Amino acid sequence: MARKKIVSGHLKNAISKDEHISVKFVNCIMRDGKKSVAEKVFKDAMELVEEKLGESSLKVFEKAIGNIRPSVEVKSRRVGGSTYQVPTEIKSSRQTALAFRWLLRFSRSRSEKGLSNKLAAELLDAYNERGGAVKKKEDTHKMAEANKAFAHFRW
């Protein structure tokens, strides 16, 4: 019998919430199934962050992700021949997934050498509430605010 609801995946290796988030992020970094490379990039980036700030790198990572996570987004709805951008709230899992995606996209587009350096720089920017990923979040929120009048089209 089919389930009506998707059961969230249980990660065997994740012991705490911190590790769960970092394992998920490593999986987002991974390309072509090369998990060991992704883990090395993440570990190196965290070491660089810890060197520069002198704080726990996982705390910095969590705060940076928290600064990037959007709470609303706009979805296109076609009503009576015209398309409206309708602001909708986002589930927690999607907020985190979008934050990961934006963080990686803007990390990869930076000019530093090596992905671990790029990721560390973008994490520090996100921690200090600046950088491309935070700007993307603000743009998304502005778009939702501008289209607030169409919120009644949500269903």
Curated annotation (Swiss-Prot):
Listed GO cellular component terms? small ribosomal subunit
Query: At the top level of its lineage, which domain of life is listed?
Result: Bacteria
Which UniProt key words apply to this protein? Ribonucleoprotein, Ribosomal protein, RNA-binding, rRNA-binding, tRNA-binding
Q: Which molecular function GO terms apply here?
A: rRNA binding; structural constituent of ribosome; tRNA binding
- What family is this protein classified in? Belongs to the universal ribosomal protein uS7 family.
Q: How does it assemble?
A: Part of the 30S ribosomal subunit. Contacts proteins S9 and S11.
Q: What does this protein do?
A: One of the primary rRNA binding proteins, it binds directly to 16S rRNA where it nucleates assembly of the head domain of the 30S subunit. Is located at the subunit interface close to the decoding center, probably blocks exit of the E-site tRNA.
Q: What is this protein called?
A: Small ribosomal subunit protein uS7
Organism whose genome encodes this protein: Desulforapulum autotrophicum (strain ATCC 43914 / DSM 3382 / VKM B-1955 / HRM2) (Desulfobacterium autotrophicum)
- UniProt lists the gene as rpsG
Q: Name one GO biological process term.
A: translation
- UniProt-listed InterPro entries: Ribosomal_uS7 (IPR000235), Ribosomal_uS7_bac/org-type (IPR005717), Ribosomal_uS7_CS (IPR020606), Ribosomal_uS7_dom (IPR023798), Ribosomal_uS7_dom_sf (IPR036823)
